[in-house]
């Protein structure tokens, strides 16, 4: 039985530079972890993962699962991602990821091995998109770069919507708004997820859909009300 969460947006398509690495024989994980050299590992957790799972995924999961429950809760997921090179992920984004990738039949916000693998692989693809549009390698993405990234994700936003999104990350200092990877991941997951949910009700891609109030609320609320 599949337990894929209905709210998880599809992973973004990889940049051509990333795909070329695969064609050249490089591991897809080297894009996110260029310094990591896989070695044979023997772990009590290995049996929880499929044989082809990258050892780094198993290692980070095992190291973060402090209570040995076989699941990662909020603080444990933050540690696992930090061990995997994703430092600085905010509480909001951690909770968003937990909600999106958790087992739907589980009432708790936590990830098992299968869900963690799905998240881990998806994050590498989001990181690849971020790196592609962070052209000056500043670790930040400006408004124009964000617009281009959304376009690449298949989300052509009206200017008013784009400006509203950018304004959510304005710190009030009057400086130009730049988004770090964490902020890009948060807004990207929400925009892409909501776009895909809308398109389920707009199969002709007309840009219009007829929704009942209940359907609208069920579509939007899970993306915006779970994380503070």
From Swiss-Prot:
- One matching Pfam family, short form? EF-hand_6
Question: Which cysteine-cysteine pairs are annotated as disulfide bonds in the entry?
Answer: none
Q: Please tell me where Ca(2+) binds in this chain.
A: 65, 67, 69, 76
Q: Which residues are in the EF-hand domain?
A: 52-87, 121-156
UniProt-listed InterPro entries: CML48/49/50, EF-hand-dom_pair, EF_Hand_1_Ca_BS, EF_hand_dom
Q: Species name for this entry?
A: Arabidopsis thaliana (Mouse-ear cress)
- Give the stretches traversing the membrane: none
Identify the gene encoding this protein. Answer: CML48
Q: What does this protein do?
A: Potential calcium sensor.
Query: Can you name this protein?
Result: Probable calcium-binding protein CML48
Q: What is the lineage of its organism?
A: Eukaryota, Viridiplantae, Streptophyta, Embryophyta, Tracheophyta
UniProt keyword annotation of Calcium present: yes
Record key words, sorted: Calcium, Metal-binding, Repeat
Keyword Calcium included in the entry's annotation: yes
A molecular function (GO) term: calcium ion binding
